Structures are given as structure tokens and as C-alpha cells.
Amino acid sequence: MASNVVVKDIMQKDVKVVNNNTVMQEVVAIMNKFDKDAILVVQSGKPTGIITVKDVLVRAVEANVPLKTVIARMVYTNPLVVIDENATIEEAAKLMKLWSIKHLPVVDKQGALVGLLDDRAVVYAVPKLMSIMQEFCLRK
């Protein structure tokens, strides 16, 4: 059943992004304001990196560097693993497991950013689908 659900059906569409030169102080402010645990870094509409809360803590705070002196490209994770919007959630789960990641930027055929998929969305999608099918089957 999960093999029929595509990434674009469950991805976050309201993705917060910054550019390579955004100061980390601003990145953290955006993460706090919108309650995001990951921010994508884009250049010309295409994702170039991702900054997670862990990245902020390990690469900036732990290094004891003032956040106003660090820019996104110094902190973000790269190379970036992305997934096509028409891939199945099963394919997404396999990619997440293979690369030990919790966030997958979602791109269209041209490589432009269209969303973000996180591990929670994948985990919640399968039981939700099972529940819908259970209700359907019980009606008969």
C-alpha cells in the first residue's frame, strides 16, 4: 500500500529557505519563529544544502563561534540527498535509512525545490492509510 503513495502527497509544501550567504543568526531566528527543525539552503531555486538543529549545535554553537559571524554555506550538510516528488514513500524511507537522514528535500524534474519530507511524515502516512482502508473494508 505504501508503494502507491507518492512523496508529493505527504510532503511539507511550506518550506522555509535561506541562501548560501544568510547569517546563521537569521537561520536560527527563522527556525524558532516557524518551529522548524530544518531549513533548506537554495541557490536559483535549487537546493544546495540543509541546516538542521543538530548542524547548528555541532558546527556553530559547539565551535563557540558567534552566530552572527557564520553563514549558511559554512554549516549546511552537503552533498545533499534529494528525492523526486513522484517517488513513492517506500523509496523515500529506503533513502532515509541508507543515508541515515531524517529530512529529504523534494524536487521536481528540473531539480527545483517543491517541498520537504521528514521521517515523521513517512511514519504517520502508513498507519493513516491503513486506518482509512480499515474503515472502508468494515463498511462492506
Residue ranges with predicted function:
Residues D14-V17, K46-P47, V82, A112:
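Short, flexible active-site loop motifs that bind/organize anionic cofactors or intermediates
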Residues M1-D14, T52-D84, T88-K97, L116-K140:
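Tandem CBS (Bateman) regulatory domains
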Residues M31-F34, I39-K54, M96, L104-R120:
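A glycine-centered beta-loop-beta connector
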Residues V17-D35, V42, V82-S100, V107, ...:
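The conserved cystathionine-beta-synthase
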